[in-house]
From Swiss-Prot:
InterPro entries: Glutathione-S-Trfase_C-like, Glutathione-S-Trfase_C_sf, Glutathione_S-Trfase, Glutathione_S-Trfase_N, GST_C, GST_Zeta, GST_Zeta_C, GST_Zeta_N. The modification Phosphoserine is found at S137, S181. Glutathione binds at S14, S15, C16, S17, W18, R19, Q45, V59, Q71, S72, Q111, N115, L116, S117. Its EC number is 5.2.1.2, 2.5.1.18. It is found in: Cytoplasm. Belongs to the GST superfamily. Zeta family. The modification Phosphothreonine is found at T136. This is Maleylacetoacetate isomerase. Pfam families: GST_C_3, GST_N_2. It comes from Rattus norvegicus. One of its GO terms (biological process) is L-phenylalanine catabolic process. The N-terminus is blocked. The keyword Disulfide bond does not apply.
Length: 216
């Protein structure tokens, strides 16, 4: 690997990994990917080698500037502080708080309830309804918030950290067959985001570890 080049430990379908891939693309940061398959061999995140990088045994993890950072929002905050152009957090403190609120609603209030480790615990037959309930509950709140904050994107007309979190979560909703018709604001924003190059190149269907049958 090229010395000094950031290295992202990622799984193609991980929405948390996708958040980081979007941010890296938006900020024009060249990086390398090390795929961590969360299914194969019982989950490569449980290997001793990976646990030395991230004791939480989760992706993403980003090696950058001589440190390794786990947790996607911590990574996004670090990238924003060290490479602030283009901005993902507005300068206005109130708008910045709203962006962080939406990001945290998704990253803490929705995604963890339907991630792989939780779904394994609820049993195969309960996974779909469990995930649907978790996402629907969160989207009910998110839709109401976005109705008052959105412009073209989640908070006004500039892409922010909230958008970086939104698109991957909508992809999860689609994968779990959530009816998105009650969420026109979410759907409208997501459509606009997926038209952007940074969201396309970082998409799960275009990653080095994407299975051939899922590539587009």
């Amino acid at each position: 690997m090229q010395a000094g080049k950031p290295v992202l430990y990622s799984y193609f379908r991980s929405s948390c990994s996708w958040r980081v891939r979007i941010a890296l693309a938006l900020k024009g940061i060249d990086y390398e990917i090390v795929p961590i398959n969360l299914i194969k061999d019982g989950g490569q995140q449980f290997s001793e080698e990976f646990q030395t990088l991230n004791p939480m045994k989760q992706v993403p993890a980003l090696k950058i500037d001589g440190i390794t950072i786990g947790q996607s929002l911590a990574i996004l905050e670090y990238l924003e502080e060290t490479r602030p152009i283009p901005r993902l957090l507005p300068q206005d403190p109130q708008k910045r708080a709203i962006v962080r609120m939406i990001s945290d609603l998704i990253a803490s209030g929705i995604q963890p309830l339907q991630n792989l480790s939780v779904l394994k615990q609820v049993g195969q037959e309960n996974q779909m309804p469990w995930a649907q309930k978790a996402i629907t509950s969160g989207f009910n709140a998110l839709e109401k918030i976005l109705q008052s904050t959105a412009g073209k994107y989640c908070v006004g007309d500039e892409v922010s950290m909230a958008d970086v979190c939104l698109a991957p979560q909508v992809a999860n909703a689609e994968r779990f067959k959530v009816d998105l018709s009650p969420y026109p604001t979410i759907s409208h924003i997501n459509k606009a985001l997926l038209a952007l190059e940074a969201f396309q190149v970082s998409h799960p269907c275009r990653q080095p570890d994407t299975p051939a049958e899922l590539r587009t």
